[in-house]
Each structure stands twice: as C-alpha cells, then as structure tokens.
Amino acid sequence: MRLVIAGSEGNIGRRLKAAFPDSIGIDVRRGADIVADLATVDFSRAVIAEALTRADAVVHLATSADPDAPDDIHWQAVANGARLFAACAHAGVPRIVVASSDWAEPKNGMTTNAYGQSKRVMEALSAMYSLAPGRDAVALRVGWVPVSVDEVPLAPDWLRDNYWDDARLLTEFRRALGLTDDGQLRAGSPP
C-alpha cells in the first residue's frame, strides 16, 4: 500500500511510519520526507502532488492532540484538514483515515470543547468525502496513546481505561486502512 502520513513526526505518526516504512511522511517538523505546513502548503507543489496522486491512502494526524489548546489551534486544524481533503479529492486518493477522538462525544460529564468540535467536523468531512464513488474516508476515534508507557500507571482511571498500546493502535489503523492484521488488502476494500 502506498501510504502518505500527514503529521508523520508526531507521537502517533512516528509509530505508523515505523510500521509502514515505505510510507511518505509530511510534517512541519524536520525528519519528515516532505517538510511542509498544512496551513500554507501549496498542494500543487510537484513533490506533494505526486505523493498524493500515487497514494492508495492518506492518514491525517497533523492536528493538536491537546484538548486544552487554545480554540484558534483547533480552528486551524479544521481549516488544514479541509484543505487536505480537497487536495486528496483533486488527486483522486481513494482512502483517507483521519484521527478523531472520543472527545467528539465526551464521557465522564465533560462538555464538548473546541477540540471535540474540531473532531466532529473532521468526522463530517470524512462522511462527505465518502459520498463520491471510489472514495472512502474513515474517522478513527483514537484512544489515549501516551508518549511513554511510563505514563500509564500515573494516569487517572478514566484515561487508563482509554489507553491504546502500540499493538491496538496498529491494529485499528490497519483496519481503517482496509488491511488485514498481516498488512494485506482486505477483500472488498478500495485499493
């Protein structure tokens, strides 16, 4: 599978990049195959247009994972996501997997904040993308993926209950990408 990972240098992106070593990473941070800011990138730039045109799937992780970040960060995440969805549609990318969160529908009596609303918008964009023939988008409500497993015993119970280890993370992303656990394309999945 030819995979592009937007947000390849973040906590989850690095894990997916390791699991899919032939993928192309796009990130604002150094170390990515393509260094670009989704807020300002020219998607017609040859290297990006070629990566998207050749992609079987794009994984979009290039958003803040901080539910308490200022609202303008989450507004920008929505704008960046919309730009990426439009570029994928133009390039004919058959599948997009976008990281959502259970903050889109919070538990424990918490109210939905800008972070949660931004995830709802990304879920709506995924549904809209999937309306076109030959296209599919999955909004995956990712659990808590700490930077280090050392954080798990220190976390409150509600967060530990939502913990995804690397095995679960990779299993869920493979499924969202239409792959079997051993990395083969699942029967009936778009290429």
Model-derived features with residue positions:
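Alpha-helical substrate-binding/gating segment
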Residues: 144-149, 162-190
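N-terminal Rossmann NAD(P)H-binding glycine-rich loop of SDR-like oxidoreductase domains
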Residues: 2-22
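SDR active-site strand-loop-helix element
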Residues: 6, 26, 61, 96-102, ...
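Active-site helix of classical SDR
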Residues: 114, 118-121
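NAD(P)H-binding glycine-rich loop region in Rossmannoid oxidoreductase-like domains
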Residues: 40-76, 103-105
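Rossmann-fold cofactor-recognition segment
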Residues: 27-43
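Conserved beta-loop-beta element that borders a ligand/cofactor-binding pocket
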Residues: 125-148
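NAD(P)-cofactor binding segment of oxidoreductase domains
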Residues: 69-96
